[in-house]
């Protein structure tokens, strides 16, 4: 059975639901709520305005379990999620949140504004499978975007950038400074060391080379 309520909605496939205005739910168990949303594939879900869940380049019923909510969001991969405004999730189990962000690695989380996409491994492969490393790029696990916004349409601008990137191999890149706070409330027996300049002058600095031949 299908349910279509409102105006110019289209519910196609078993147990599909389209409610609102010009929504399209196609594929078993898919739901589209709001205005001009498309849930294309099995068990996909959209809510809001002009969101797309599923890969519309494929046949009805292919892919599934994608979610897009908010405005202008696209979740095109299996079990992906795109939230808020004009975000895109293009790889399996990836999630994009914020404004104009893109999550294009497996299981990746993109937040913030207009991150730089295309880094890591944008294929559907993951570097660690069945307890063994496959040799593929570890890929990006988490990114915070700090790119610009296009004032004419409120979407991502032409200058994407990243404030912080964490890769699956544990490496990370921070674009700015890292400030580590020292909270006095968490400490006891605080004793003043007195003059420490003479002690600092005793520090014997060293340079060395890592085994990977990267000079430090």
Task: Explain the meaning of each model-derived region.
Residues 162-216:
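C-terminal intramolecular chaperone/autoprocessing and neck/assembly modules of extracellular spikes
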């Amino acid at each position: 059975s299908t349910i279509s309520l409102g105006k110019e909605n289209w519910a196609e496939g078993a147990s599909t639901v389209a409610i609102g205005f010009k929504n399209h739910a196609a594929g078993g168990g898919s739901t589209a709520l709001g205005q001009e949303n498309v849930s294309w594939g099995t068990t996909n879900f959209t809510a809001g305005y002009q969101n797309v869940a599923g890969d519309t380049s494929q046949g009805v019923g292919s892919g599934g379990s994608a979610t897009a909510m908010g405005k202008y969001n696209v979740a095109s991969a299996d079990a992906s999620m795109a939230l808020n405004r004009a975000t895109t999730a293009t790889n399996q189990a990836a999630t994009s949140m914020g404004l104009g962000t893109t999550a294009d690695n497996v299981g990746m989380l993109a937040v913030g504004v207009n991150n730089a996409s295309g880094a890591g491994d944008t294929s559907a492969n993951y570097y660690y499978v069945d307890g063994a490393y496959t040799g593929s790029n570890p890929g990006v696990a988490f990114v915070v975007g700090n790119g610009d916004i296009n004032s004419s349409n409120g979407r991502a601008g032409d200058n994407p950038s990243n404030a912080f990137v964490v890769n699956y191999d544990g490496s990370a890149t921070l674009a700015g400074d890292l400030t580590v706070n020292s909270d006095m409330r968490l400490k006891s027996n605080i004793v003043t060391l007195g003059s420490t300049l003479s002690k600092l002058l005793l520090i014997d600095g060293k340079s060395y080379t890592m085994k990977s031949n990267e000079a430090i």
